Amino acid sequence: FYEFAHLMTYDEVYDLLEKCFGDRMIAEYILENSRKLGEKFTFYSLERKQMIPKVEVKDYPKSWKWFSEGNCRYPLIRELCFSDNIQERYWINECLLGLKEKNLYKTEYLARIEIEADVIKYIGEKLDDCLFAYFNTFKHYIDLFWECGSIVGPGRGSATGFLSNYLLGITQLDPIRWNLPYWRFLNKERAELPDIDIDLAPSKRPAIFEAIRRERGPLGLVQVATFGTEGTKSAVLTACRGYRSDDYPDGIDVDVAQYMSSLIPQERGFLWDINDVIYGNEEKDRKPVTAFIREMKQYPGLLEIITSICGLVNKRGIHASGVILYGEDPFETASFMKAPNGDIITCYDLHKAEAAGDTKYDFLVTEVSDKIIKCFDMLHEDKVIQNDNLRDTYNKYIHPEVIDTNDPAIWEHLAAGDVLDVFQFSGGVGLAIAKKLKPKNPLEMTAANAMMRLMSEKGVESQQDRYARIQKQGIEVFDYEMRQRHMPEEIIEKMHNHCDTYYGCCAIQEQMMEILMDVAHFTLGEANNARKIVAKKQMSKIPELRKQVYDKMQNDIIADYVWEIAVRPQLGYAFSMNHSLPYSFVGIQTIYLAMHFNPIYWNTACLIVNSGATDEEAGGQTDYGKIAKAIGDITSSGIKVSLANINKSGFGFAPDVENNQILFGMKGMLNVGDDVITAIIENRPYSSIKDFYYKVKPSKQTMISLIKGGAFDEMEDRKFAMAWYIWETCEKKSRITLQNMPSLIKYGMLPEDTEERIM
């Protein structure tokens, strides 16, 4: 087979046909027919322009009701109000309605709407589609997410900078109040479809997907396929697994293969390319790995196998967040297959799907959303808060606009690290940076959120250390530093303007872009390209970017400083301001829930989610290992988790406010099934272990687990409970034999005068 598995020449095909049929005339006839068929082929392409999924929207009448008749200060707003396109009329009316409801009907906000509408319309015309429909579709599904019982996060990524997204309820932060750059999301220099990311609750995403499919059809929502490739390490392991030679007929030992793969260096989270491992790379200051080369020489041909399979597709999977919404005929642009877990996914990966005309939506998940939902559920159940719908409850208590961020208690808790699972600040790095920088407002928390991800080069002051140093010594230190480096007054003023908020640091993507535009004379498009190179770690393009900065500046002293302050710190992993600020507000929400209500509710919610028990009543499998780890983590924080209580415990963990502890859930107990738990709850209360036993009639394994797990401790001593159960259920012996005597003597169960009686 492999002998013929290549594109043959005319002569090769002719010779094979002649050998096959033994007749030159037949071979010539077949080739002639093939040529005629080839002439009839019609070229076609699967590529087409991307189509924006549409949803039905309210048909607002053509009207100028929002303004006086003579008001023409906003010509595009007026044009949209009278547009023949229902999607355009809906978008502008919903935005203006949002301004009214939020008491933001002001010149500055109307002017921003005019700007954003202009950008959306311009890009839509370039793409030959109504781009306003993209936002209307997103608004429709945001409303659906809330109806399905999921929290929708305050924002994620650059979309937070667009005022219209805020007014439509897609995001929750006023970008004008927080000075978030709208051009970071959409601008005329980048005429492409926007990319809005949404954070949902993991436990609710399946229900959300089903709701969308009910609305759009079984293939109305399909997750995007991914195709994994052989990386440097996996290529080594794969090659070793299949390697055979005369000297090694049984192949290479697994331990040896693991050792060889461990020799592949890693830098800034990326494995070296196999060519860099073997030959080095002067541009990246990489030297050949001698130990790896030595191992390769022991196995002739192994290196050739590794280099030939590096980068080849070796598996398929499901995109973490990407979904595509299809219309009436999904097969117009797509074909489908099943993922390893059985879910239907696209046959194309993301880039090919978009090239075929599909539009991706990103529906991500964060566990903190489940924790907030669980916390609200328990507060509702205990009647601590009113039983409103989830969206109203969220808006009433923890919407970013209702939390008083001037409350010093929030920042004291953040710095102290005494609130469990503060979003983005619960790990060792997050706790350390919160204690080190001690943020006192959302912007400072945003800086801390961004800086914890920046990796500094060896021997270079980290951004966290620089921030803490200048925060302590005063911003004058930053000014003195620039003057010592002989920066012109104009540059000093601009750098103060961009960096003073963060104490002379550049930890935010937009900061770097603004400095490059303002100081290094980059265009918006060039600055955005620089951001992509840095954010996506395109290390091969860094030298080219550095040269561009120096060429633009035409002053090496200033260029050195701009590169050192604005670009080099972000080569690790920088956050966008439009992303970091809403994420900081999620952290604030978690602190607020723990301090505004009894913290036992928040702590219990964290334990439920961390133990994987979010759907404790759904009959799912119990992961005892995960539960044990979650309990260990939470008790190490000084939070008490009590044993199960037969009269109080439910399926999952529950807050015991009276005793300020978390009550263990019975679903986490071995041999205690869902049906039994349901029966236990339905037959309460129980006055004794005997009362329980005859009401529920559990199996032997279940009863022993409940006794050993302490479920009856408030009623009876555990040993007495077990003894009663054995006495009550085991068949009584009418006589004993000599075989029983050793046990009777051992446990002292014979009368004291037994020996005298026998004698």
Where are these regions (language model features)?
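Alpha-helical scaffold/interaction cores of sigma-54-like transcription cofactors
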Residues: F1-M759
